[in-house]
Amino acid sequence: MSSIPNINWNDPNNGKSNTSRQSQPQPQLPSNVSPPNSRAVPTSGSIGGPQYGSSQFSNEYSRNPNTIGGPPFPLQSNQRGYMPNTGYPVQQTAQQRSGDKLQQVHSQQQQQQQQQQQPLYQQYPPQSVGYLAGDVYNPQHQEYVQMNQLPNQHYNLQQRQQAQGQQLKSQLNEQNAMMSASTQQYPVQDFTNPYPNAQNPAEQQQQQQPLRTQSQQWDGYQSQPLYSAAGNTIPSSIQQQIPPQNLSPSEQQQVKQQQPSPPEQGTKKKPGRKPKLRKLSESSSETPQVPKTASSSSSSPTAVNSGKPITKRSRMGCLTCRQRKKRCCETRPRCTECTRLRLNCTWPKPGTEHKNKPKDQKDDENTIEHAEFGRIKVLRGIVEYRSK
């Protein structure tokens, strides 16, 4: 039993003989370092106790002990002897305890200095959603929420609402007083005669009466006059819409005569195509009733020759374009289409525009004399067959 060496696993000289450990000088441990054993060891050291080769290893192993169940981080000086399962002795000598107390005081001073350097953050109580949803930059809202959330201040919401209601009422009363003072009616200043005669008080009263009647009040609401006091005239268009009230029968008749009568629907008709059997005399008698816009819109020379109003539906071109069903520009003596195709541009006689022509005459008009082929029929849209 005595031959087994006392092996200390925390010793850096583990596995060596005891003689080599005894021959080495024993450095004196500092007072604030305690050996990693469960029993108290005197500072002077003994042969059987744990001995260290240098103070560097002792400090390192005391700060970070490799004990089972101990913390992996280095322990502070004020935590030694208080952490469980760290291998530090709970019972220490008086010198070690005094050193630990000095270190504790020093660490407390350092913590106080760090707290003074760091800004202080106060933890506020949790706030309701209504405060976050409200207007943060509204000082009245913040004051209202703070006074409701603080538990020490008992604030009555009804009293606050009553005070606000009284303030609003007082403000409304002041505004009404200002409005009544500003809307006070004064006689209209006459710029042509700035110094009116004081001998006609009746005329001044008559001038002030329409101003008073125009502005009426409904439940404290002062209506603005529709028209200026200088004019006092209603437009004629509005006068026609307003029904006459308190008028004598003779005045009502005069008002009705002044109002324009509605247009009669059955008298006027749109000018259209006349029947084919109607004579020129009947059409000439109806020409004064036709509005001027229709005659002015027609720029064709047929209006001068026939004396009939020409509209877009009744406008007719040359007989060649009508037979070919082409649009005619109605230029005389030859239209543009007939000139381009070198066709015979024939115009109907006045008064015979709507009459049907016999088939032989139509064929004669649609045929031309060709130099090589003789008399041929003109086809629509074909330009190859041309006359001289």
From Swiss-Prot:
Chain residues forming the annotated DNA-binding region: 318-345
Major site of localization recorded for this protein: nucleus
Keyword Transcription attributed: yes
Feature: compositional bias, Basic residues: 268-278
Keywords: DNA-binding, Metal-binding, Nucleus, Transcription, Transcription regulation, Zinc
Biased amino acid composition, Basic and acidic residues: 351-367
Domain of life: Eukaryota
InterPro entries: Zn2-C6_fun-type_DNA-bd_sf, Zn2Cys6_DnaBD
Compositional bias of kind Polar residues: 1-19, 52-67, 88-97, 173-203, 282-294
Record keyword Glycosyltransferase present: no
The protein's role, per its UniProt record: Perhaps a regulatory role. May be involved in transcriptional activation.
Protein name: Zinc finger protein 1
Chain's gene name: CZF1
